[in-house]
């Protein structure tokens, strides 16, 4: 059993992960701007403040905090918020851990499959592939670099590159469940995905096995925008149309952010499967059936 501190613990993944960790007998503390529960502690990036009680006898930190990539159009200011919310928060954690002379057993950080860049190709990306040259690649690269500084404190560091997280409430699926379901753009871009339970189980595995390095947390079954949408329509008993939402409409609606809807490649799960990680929901149909 371990004492675990989570940032972003009140979000979609953090809430589920906290529940699963506690069921295993771990003690979980959550950093939040507005603490309400006994296990929640205040932090404020704007003033570089963290309640030091949160670090008492801590073993692991799981860093999930970060402004939503797809919540708002990518203005210059919004891009800065997206990066700073991930990097500055990791820097503040590092400063506090060093200042308090804490011997961490591990630092686990979220990242995204956007590390490889938002592009559509026939290449299947593995963890050793180079970082993408676009904005998503920049975000993930800086995010991961901020996490890797914990290696200087002799703490094992792992980064979890995550695809679309499938959950019953909130997240991408909520926005995709439109009255009529269709693919986006030309429909041929791939959508790396993972069921929230599998994702949380991998975070737990990272702790229990003291994993180090980068890992693609994606399900092994590949889907394009069209095949994903068709499977979603069947699972939710909603009509599916073969006519995709045109790219130009998405670009008008979302600006540069539309790239995350219109581009995507396959991402390999082989590394985590080779570690013996077993997906509870390896196929999209079974994942959606459980959720709906």
Where are these regions (language model features)?
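N-terminal Rossmann NAD(P)H-binding glycine-rich loop of SDR-like oxidoreductase domains
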Residues: 4-24
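NAD(P)H-binding glycine-rich loop region in Rossmannoid oxidoreductase-like domains
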Residues: 43-92
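Glycine/proline-rich active-site loop of Rossmann-fold NAD(P)-dependent oxidoreductases
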Residues: 141, 153-155, 165-175, 206-215
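C-terminal amphipathic/interface module of NAD(P)-dependent oxidoreductases
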Residues: 259-292
């Amino acid at each position: 059993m371990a004492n675990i501190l989570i940032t972003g613990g009140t979000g979609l993944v953090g809430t589920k992960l906290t529940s699963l960790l506690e069921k295993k007998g771990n003690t979980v503390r959550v950093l939040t701007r507005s603490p309400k529960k006994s296990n929640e502690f205040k932090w404020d990036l704007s003033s570089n403040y963290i309640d030091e009680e949160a670090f008492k006898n801590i073993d692991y930190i799981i860093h999930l905090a970060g402004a939503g990539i797809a919540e708002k159009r990518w203005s210059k200011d919004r891009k800065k918020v997206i990066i700073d919310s991930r990097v500055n928060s990791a820097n503040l954690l590092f400063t506090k851990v060093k200042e308090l002379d804490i011997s961490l057993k591990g630092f686990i950080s979220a990242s995204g499959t956007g590390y490889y860049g938002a592009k559509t190709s026939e290449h299947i990306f593995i963890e050793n592939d180079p970082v993408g040259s676009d904005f998503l690649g920049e975000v993930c690269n800086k995010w991961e670099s901020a996490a890797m500084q914990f290696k200087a404190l002799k703490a094992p560091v792992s980064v979890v590159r995550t695809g679309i997280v499938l959950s019953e409430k909130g997240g991408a699926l909520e926005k995709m469940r439109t009255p009529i379901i269709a693919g986006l753009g030309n429909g041929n871009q791939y959508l790396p995905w993972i069921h929230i339970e599998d994702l949380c189980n991998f975070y737990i595995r990272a702790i229990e096995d003291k994993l180090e390095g980068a890992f693609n947390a994606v399900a092994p079954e590949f889907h394009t925008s069209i095949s994903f949408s068709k499977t979603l329509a069947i699972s939710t008993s909603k009509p599916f149309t073969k006519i995709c939402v045109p790219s130009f409409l998405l670009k008008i609606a979302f600006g540069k952010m539309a790239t995350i809807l219109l581009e995507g490649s396959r991402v390999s799960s082989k590394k985590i499967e080779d570690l013996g990680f077993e997906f509870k929901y390896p196929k999209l149909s079974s994942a959606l059936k459980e959720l709906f």
